[in-house]
Curated annotation (Swiss-Prot):
Signal peptide: none annotated. Expressed by the venom gland. Transmembrane segments: none annotated. A motif (Cell attachment site) lies at residues 43-45. Residues 1-65 form the Disintegrin domain. Inhibits integrins alpha-IIb/beta-3 (ITGA2B/ITGB3), alpha-V/beta-3 (ITGAV/ITGB3), and alpha-5/beta-1 (ITGA5/ITGB1). Belongs to the disintegrin family. Dimeric disintegrin subfamily. The lineage of its organism: Eukaryota, Metazoa, Chordata, Craniata, Vertebrata. It comes from Cerastes cerastes (Horned desert viper). SUPFAM superfamilies: Blood coagulation inhibitor (disintegrin). GO terms for cellular component: extracellular region. The keyword Lipid biosynthesis does not apply. This is Disintegrin CC8A. Heterodimer with CC8B; disulfide-linked.
Length: 65
C-alpha cells in the first residue's frame, strides 16, 4: 500500500485516526459504506452482496436456492 494514500498513516500505513479503512469494495473516502450498499451485483445463480457497514470487505457470495 502506498504511504501517500490519503487514508493511510504515513508511518504505519494503517487507517489514520478517525478513519475506518484504506481500501476495499465497501470503503469510500476512508469510511465504511452504509449497511445495505450493494458491493457485488447479482450474476447467474448469485444474489446481490451487500456491505455490512463494519468492514471494507464485501461478504461472500450468496447463492439463490
Amino acid at each position: 500500500m502506498n504511504s501517500a494514500h490519503p487514508c493511510c498513516d504515513p508511518v504505519t500505513c494503517k487507517p489514520k485516526r478517525g478513519e475506518h479503512c484504506i481500501s476495499g469494495p465497501c470503503c469510500r473516502n476512508c469510511k465504511f459504506l452504509s449497511p445495505g450498499t450493494i458491493c457485488k451485483k447479482a450474476r447467474g445463480d448469485d444474489m446481490n452482496d451487500y456491505c455490512t457497514g463494519i468492514s471494507s470487505d464485501c461478504p461472500r457470495n450468496r447463492i439463490k436456492k
